[in-house]
């Protein structure tokens, strides 16, 4: 499903073939959809969170994590952009909104969710890009977040590589 084709209440249920999808993975998927709506429609995050809740789109998610990701990424978007921008081959403004929000979420987690291994953060971001991003965007995002992790998680990265 492409985010540009997204319709409220559609695509947030966990399909039978993906019943094993983790709560965190589902939370990230729905958070990405909320951030896309925030960026494209310029809606307030509080209104988006309320809408998602009222529409039942937070089923099978960690609601606290969803709220944290949406609020923190939206409130600190420019700061998060600065963390991955040095590794881009173009201006941040030229990055597709879906890919931009995937990278924002990734660097947010790399910086603030130290209990989640950096490889998990990158893998989850790559999977979001495969599912919602443009063709081959997952390769681009993988490279950018891997470089960002060198600065944000340098000790962890040197110990595991």
UniProtKB/Swiss-Prot annotation:
Q: Which UniProt keywords apply?
A: RNA-binding, Transcription, Transcription antitermination, Transcription regulation
> What GO terms are given for molecular function?
RNA binding
Q: Which InterPro entries does its entry note?
A: NusB-like_sf, NusB_fam, NusB_RsmB_TIM44
Q: Where is this region: Disordered?
A: 1-22
Top-level taxon of the source organism: Bacteria
SUPFAM superfamilies from the xrefs?
Answer: NusB-like
Its Gene Ontology cellular component terms are: cytosol
Q: Which GO terms describe its biological process?
A: DNA-templated transcription termination; transcription antitermination
Gene3D superfamilies attached to this UniProt entry: NusB-like
Which Pfam family is an annotated match for this chain, by its short name? NusB
Per the entry, what this protein does is: Involved in transcription antitermination. Required for transcription of ribosomal RNA (rRNA) genes. Binds specifically to the boxA antiterminator sequence of the ribosomal RNA (rrn) operons.
Which family, according to UniProt? Belongs to the NusB family.
Xref: HAMAP family: NusB
Full protein name: Transcription antitermination protein NusB
Q: Which organism is it from?
A: Hydrogenovibrio crunogenus (strain DSM 25203 / XCL-2) (Thiomicrospira crunogena)
| Chain's gene name | nusB
């Amino acid at each position: 499903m492409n985010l540009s084709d997204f319709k409220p209440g559609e695509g947030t249920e966990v399909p039978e073939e993906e019943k094993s999808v983790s709560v965190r993975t589902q939370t990230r998927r729905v958070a990405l959809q909320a951030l896309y709506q925030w960026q494209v429609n310029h809606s307030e995050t509080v209104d988006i969170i309320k809408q998602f809740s009222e529409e039942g789109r937070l089923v099978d998610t960690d609601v606290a994590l969803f709220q944290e990701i949406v609020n923190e990424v939206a409130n600190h978007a420019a700061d998060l952009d600065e963390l991955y921008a040095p590794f881009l081959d173009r201006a941040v403004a030229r990055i597709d909104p879906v890919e931009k929000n995937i990278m924002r979420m990734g660097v947010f987690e790399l910086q603030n969710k130290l209990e989640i291994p950096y490889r998990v953060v990158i893998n989850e971001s790559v999977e979001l890009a495969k599912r919602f991003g443009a063709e081959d965007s997952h390769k681009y995002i993988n490279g950018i977040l891997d470089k960002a992790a060198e600065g944000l998680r340098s000790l962890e990265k040197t110990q595991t590589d």
